[in-house]
Amino acid sequence: MCIRDSYYADTCGEKELSDVLLDVLDTPVSPELLPPEDGKISQKTEDLVGPYELHDFYLYYVLRFGYSPAKIFRLALQAFEGSYDRETILKWLKTFYRRFFAQQFKRSCLPDGPKVGSVAVSPRGDLRMPSDACSRLWLKELEMIEKGER
């Protein structure tokens, strides 16, 4: 279900350029500059954090509207019906919250720069979150969903 914007590559009229652009689009994002094993990338970010489309969805509704984990979970169930099952959505939502809080210290020490867009995790924009924030409450709500208590 990942959206792939290949319009320019498909319409530029230059085969060599088109081939390079399509190759870039087809290359998975990797967090490390590890050499490929047998010609294949050995580490892919999506394998570690889950589908980007789910994380983008979670991030948007957390930052733009401040929705609770339970509400985001319900919205994701509807939005991704037929693409992801309940367990997959919940698994990656828990991963999202765990990583979102654990990585906050990295965002707090960013250099000055402009805010771009309506949703941002940068402290120079709208996010005012302490570096030592704890994810316990959010993860507890997700555990309640997992147990069927919510």
Locations of regions flagged by a protein language model:
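ATP/NTP-dependent adenylation/nucleotidyl-transfer catalytic domains that generate, transfer
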Residues: R4-R150
